[in-house]
Design a protein with these regions (language model features):
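Acidic, glycine-enriched loop/beta-strand segments at the rims
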Residues: 36-48, 364-375, 380, 422-428, ...
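Bacterial N-terminal signal peptides
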Residues: 10-22
Length: 510
């Protein structure tokens, strides 16, 4: 079979010569002496992989040929490239095409357009990436909040009318026609927080009719978490399409310890035939805007702020990662800032939120970002180990949360190797074949002949994250080499000058 596939590639070259077409480059690469983890979760096998062009041609005990570029893996693990199902790389990818925080984790494909916000129109974003490619592959969802802003105007806090919903549905159709994977929502953020369930369901149904998928930052990850879980289950039930919970978490003290109950509920939904899944990053603290903690959006509501301090994020666990009105606050906890201001933590939170709002109104730019420590380690482990949870970063290219540079190596080095939460094979599965399945990608995520040659070579004994809240951009160690579409973009821990990334469009149909 491998010989026939190789012959096919070489016949293409001869055909190109006959027709005067450009000659494709056959970047034949043979990787030998590798412990191959194919992404399925099966035990690793010692062997070799041959790459021809952008595809995996053969897997097994292969003999080098004179035309091969030989790479000796020296016993390291060779796995499929990692797929980041929840990425904010779109915020800076057009100006940071090397995508260093992703490549150095072994990530070869990012899925952007998350939390209800996407580049608009996607056609232009995709064209820019095709004209000047990045190092990584990119796929995208359509953002519900982006559609809402386009139809209703920014700052609108009303429920959409039937006419406005239809206008959103029309724009959604155009974006899906551009190749978007499906619809993303950020129902805890503005303006999604003001949408009705009917509005979201209508757009979800339109997405399902076109063969798309649904991913959601739930309407609440704390106060009204149970209702939010019911909402996404109902969307999956009514539409019949796959639905995914973004960065699944239990971000409130009263919810701590309830991961088994949640997973039982999700398993029951799956038994009913609802294709519900989740992604997760391996940290007990998140990053977002201050006002996401105040659903009424009132920075003067001291009772709501008191609840935040007691149940959602203790003052010592709130760290500011962006505060342009007073840049010296970056890296400090709320307790430290309150001390500098001679205020209580609650008073400081209220005042800082007001400053942030004023800055945003004046400049049109974000007034704050903060890290909040809200999750329990036991819940995190239970949710991560669920067979239908894949790994993500929820990070961008300039993310001051360590997840942006460390999520995947942290799972490999800490949770799989050191904590033995699951096997290395299972960890790789949660980073490759499982996310590919959740996204409907048919030719990525496994080491298998005919699949795209997105690969990562790493040392299972040393791989680990190094990024911290104080040094969030420290690259991981233990990731040696990375290939994207058959081209090496990282060699011996150093990036190459290649930019072979592609736009990955939805190919599924109703």
């Amino acid at each position: 079979m491998g010989q026939r596939r190789e012959l096919f590639f070489r016949l293409l070259v001869l055909l190109g010569l006959c027709l005067g077409a450009p000659i494709p480059t056959l970047a034949d690469t043979l990787i030998v002496n590798a412990l191959v983890l194919d992404g399925t979760g099966s035990p690793g096998q010692r062997g070799s992989i041959r790459i021809i062009g952008d595809q995996i041609s053969d897997v097994g005990n292969l003999t080098a040929r004179a035309t091969d570029t030989l790479v000796d893996a020296q016993g390291l693990v060779l796995s499929p490239g990692f797929i980041d199902t929840h990425s904010h790389a779109d915020e800076h990818l057009l100006t940071q095409r090397n995508a260093a925080p992703k490549i150095t984790q072994g990530i070869t494909t990012v899925i952007v357009g998350q939390d209800g916000s996407s580049p608009y129109p996607l056609k232009n974003f995709f064209q820019a990436l095709e004209q000047t490619p990045a190092k990584i592959n990119v796929a995208a969802y359509v953002g519900h909040n982006t559609l809402r802003d386009a139809v209703m105007g920014k700052g609108n806090r009303e429920e959409a009318t039937p006419s406005q919903m239809q206008s959103m549905a029309s724009l959604l159709g155009s974006e899906l026609n551009s190749g978007a994977i499906g619809l993303s929502t950020g129902l805890e953020y503005e303006p999604g927080i003001y949408s009705s369930r009917a509005e979201v369901l209508l757009l979800a149904q339109q997405t399902a009719q076109r063969g798309g998928r649904y991913i959601s930052h739930l309407r609440s990850e704390d106060r009204w978490f149970e209702d939010s879980i019911e909402e996404i289950i109902e969307i999956g039930r009514v539409t019949g399409m796959p639905v995914q919970i973004s960065h699944i978490k239990l971000a409130m003290k009263r919810l701590w310890g309830s991961a088994p109950v949640l997973l039982k509920q999700l398993d029951a939904a799956r038994d009913e035939g609802i294709d519900i899944t989740a992604d997760i990053y391996p940290y007990t603290f998140w990053q977002s805007h201050m006002m996401v903690l105040l659903p009424e959006r009132d920075p003067l509501d001291m009772s709501a702020i008191d609840l935040v301090m007691r149940e959602l994020a203790p003052p010592e666990g709130i760290i500011f990662t962006h505060f342009p009105a007073e840049p010296s606050y970056v890296g400090k906890t709320l307790v430290e800032i309150a001390g500098l201001r001679n205020e209580s933590p609650g008073e400081a939170f209220s005042q800082l939120a007001q400053q942030s709002i004023a800055y945003e109104e004046k400049t049109g730019q974000s007034g704050d970002m903060m890290i909040g420590t809200s999750m329990d380690e036991g819940d995190l482990r239970d949710l991560m180990a669920w067979p239908h949870t894949n790994i993500c970063t929820d990070g961008g290219l300039q993310d001051r949360h360590p997840r942006g540079a460390g999520s995947f190596p942290r799972v490999l080095g800490y949770y799989a190797r050191d904590a033995a939460l699951f096997s290395l094979e299972s960890a790789v599965h949660k980073m490759s074949a499982l996310p590919a399945q959740h996204l409907g990608m048919k030719d990525r995520g496994m080491i298998k002949p005919g699949y795209k040659a997105d690969l990562v070579l790493f040392d299972p004994a040393t791989v680990i994250d190094r990024a911290t809240t104080s040094e969030p951009f420290l690259a991981a160690v233990g990731i040696s080499d990375v290939w994207v579409n058959g081209t090496r973009v990282m060699e011996n821990g150093h990036q190459t000058e290649a930019y072979p990334g592609r736009v990955v469009r939805r190919t599924s149909t109703p």
